From Swiss-Prot:
PANTHER family to which the protein is assigned, alphabetical: BIFUNCTIONAL NUCLEASE 1, VON HIPPEL-LINDAU PROTEIN
GO biological process, one term: protein ubiquitination
Lineage of source species: Eukaryota, Viridiplantae, Streptophyta, Embryophyta, Tracheophyta
Stretches assigned to the BFN domain: 119-254
Protein name: Bifunctional nuclease 2
Length: 325
């Protein structure tokens, strides 16, 4: 059953603030642009596009075309419903990775502790790897026993905020992800799970699933960037699932088991490896990441003098590294 026709609604009075100013306040520092403006929201079977474009009204009434269709496809499936145990998806966890560099020999993942993990495609028919400089990334480990990793290139700010959430770093001012989490709670919904569902060319897509508190048959689905969806999932402590076809076609695996399995000592029958404990040497990469994190957090909290101080320390460290090289 479907109904279509014009709907009369009272025109909204022109706001004093232009939309560009509102958008800029949500996309501070240019890092979270179009994070939620313009996203597609699917409420059961009603699909609507939330447009950030504001049109000032010239009349008291305006005509809007709307549509409504049946909530069943004939098989009892309610549009917007989902199954957390869908066999097409597999659970994953977030690794504490900082950046990913790719080249002809594969991938190199830099971990938060400064260690480098060299990887290659999980299958011989994987995508061709274009050479690229180190880029901020979120790395997911597929929890199916295969030790497959899925690197997702993101902007630097979402990567830093994700590491802050994983390490429980306190940020004085609320981030956009904390605001969204509180908005969802106020609306009477809860985050159920996040899914990385497809890739369009080189860009991954994600879905955020919400359910009504007390009535899980009522759900809403949002299409988001993976960096935003994963940040929300970590803060809400919900599963992050990856489509199995993506894990198979784009997944990578470590090819340096020798470095990871070198015995560094035995204690009470436990084998400690080089990767499991520090070697006592200063790690310049970890120090550099700490300075970058402190600088970005200070900028988010609008402590610009502190951010400038961290920036100067970072430039000094990098200049020393260049001289050493």
């Amino acid at each position: 059953m479907a109904m279509e026709g014009p709907i009369l609604c009272r025109a909204v009075m022109q706001a004093k603030l232009p939309v560009t100013m509102i958008s800029n306040s949500l996309t501070k520092s240019g890092q979270l642009g179009t994070a939620f403006l313009g996203c597609v929201c699917k409420y059961r079977n009603i699909t609507r596009l939330i447009s950030p474009i504001y049109q000032p009204a010239q009349k008291n009434f305006a005509t809007v075309c709307g549509s409504f269709s049946s909530s069943s496809d004939g098989n009892g499936y309610m549009a917007g419903n989902f199954s957390e145990s869908d066999e097409d998806y597999v659970n994953s966890t977030v690794l504490e990775a900082v950046e990913v560099r790719s080249g002809a020999e594969g991938y190199v993942i830099k971990m938060r502790d400064g260690k480098n993990l060299r990887c290659v495609h999980n299958n011989s028919q994987g995508r061709n790897i274009p050479e690229s400089a180190p880029q901020p990334a979120i790395v997911l480990r597929i929890e199916d026993g295969s030790e497959t990793l899925l690197p997702i290139i993101v902007l630097e700010m979402p990567s830093v905020l994700l590491m802050a959430a994983i390490r429980n770093v306190h940020i004085a001012r609320p981030t956009i992800y904390q605001v969204v989490k509180e908005m969802i709670d106020k609306m009477g919904y809860e985050v159920k799970l996040v899914r990385i569902n497809k890739r369009i060319q080189e860009a991954y897509c994600a879905e955020l699933f919400l359910t009504k508190v007390g009535d899980h048959t009522e759900s809403i689905t949002f299409d988001l960037r993976p960096s935003d969806a994963i940040n929300i999932a970590v803060r809400c402590k919900v599963p992050i699932q990856v489509h199995r076809s993506l894990a198979y076609s784009d997944g990578i695996r470590s090819v340096e088991p020798a470095r990871m399995a070198i015995a560094a000592g035995m204690s009470d029958g436990l084998l400690f490896t080089e990767l499991d404990r520090p070697d006592g040497q200063p790690c310049v990469e970890a120090q550099e990441f700490g300075l970058i994190r402190n600088m970005l957090i200070a900028a988010v909290e609008e402590r610009y003098k502190d951010a400038a101080t961290w920036r100067d320390k970072l430039m000094l460290l990098r200049s020393k590294r260049k001289n050493w090289a």
